[in-house]
Amino acid sequence: GFSYPGHVVFEHLNMDFKIGGKYALVGESGSGKTTLLRLLLGQLQANKGAVLFDQMDASIYDPKTFSDQMAYIEQNVFLFHTTVRENITLGGDFTEEQIEEALRNSALYEDLKLFENGLNTDAGENGRKLSGGQRQRIAVARALIHNRKILIMDEGTSALDKENAKIIEKSLLEEPDITLILVSHHLEKNEMKKYTKVYHLGEKVSA
């Protein structure tokens, strides 16, 4: 459970995320989505009970353990004032084939022709030279190429058109090694069927 002074956010909350599973957390504004994300990311500690990671209390782990395995993609993606390539690779040594695969799976590959200098295009300060959708896709490509095993997306495709959102959704849902946690204020019934489990925040939740 978790409470702020004078306000209970979660009580008897029980969620189970298995390796390789695809999960959706759905709730309206004020349902506790942001608080839950901060708990999952280790930014908050539960007042009662615990967040377990590999069956161990998450609080015992070094924060780098999470950052090495987890990627958090939010609506307002942060980019460095450098090239598109550097924002994806973060200076890592990757082959052109690995970069292309990440670009295709993040629906960014076709946009290269729109960039003045392709991958070497300057993204600008915090990516201001790119659209919101392009920034989100760069964040997805970054997570994929760095082999992050847990991907948390907080409305992470909100700036994308339906076609590109579907490309990303398909690649992530079909990747068996990625544990996907999608956070959304709404999910259509036909979309829910694609997920291992859908948790509705604001309701009594159990595993």
Where are these predicted regions, by residue range?
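ABC ATPase nucleotide-binding domain helical subdomain, centered on the C-loop/LSGGQ "ABC signature"
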Residues: A50-L52, I60, R85-E125, I168-K170
